[in-house]
Curated annotation (Swiss-Prot):
Protein name: Co-chaperonin GroES
Family recorded in the similarity comment: Belongs to the GroES chaperonin family.
Source taxon at top rank: Bacteria
Annotated CDD domains: cpn10
UniProt-listed PANTHER family: 10 KDA HEAT SHOCK PROTEIN, CO-CHAPERONIN GROES
InterPro entries: Chaperonin_GroES, Chaperonin_GroES_sf, Chaprnonin_Cpn10_CS, GroES-like_sf
Gene: groES
Keywords of the record: Chaperone, Cytoplasm
Amino acid sequence: MKIRPLADRVVIKKVEAEEKTASGIVLPGAAKEQPQIAEVVEVGPGGIVEGKEIKMELTVGDKVIFQKYSGTEVKIEGQEYTILRQSDVLAVIE
């Protein structure tokens, strides 16, 4: 199954959070900080959003930093993804 985002939305897959601290302490699932780094897996077409033309600046494969608590998390075929607006992406990691 493929996800096709609409308008100015992108689909990202979060990079796994560290399971150990720098000092070697193993963190339980709830104690791990949610990652804010992800890989873009699909990009919407852009278009007119709220009266403004939106040009998509992201491409599939980009590694990005996104705002905490943004987007909608979905699980498809056992994989977890987040769908969010391009404006919720803060930076591209090069």
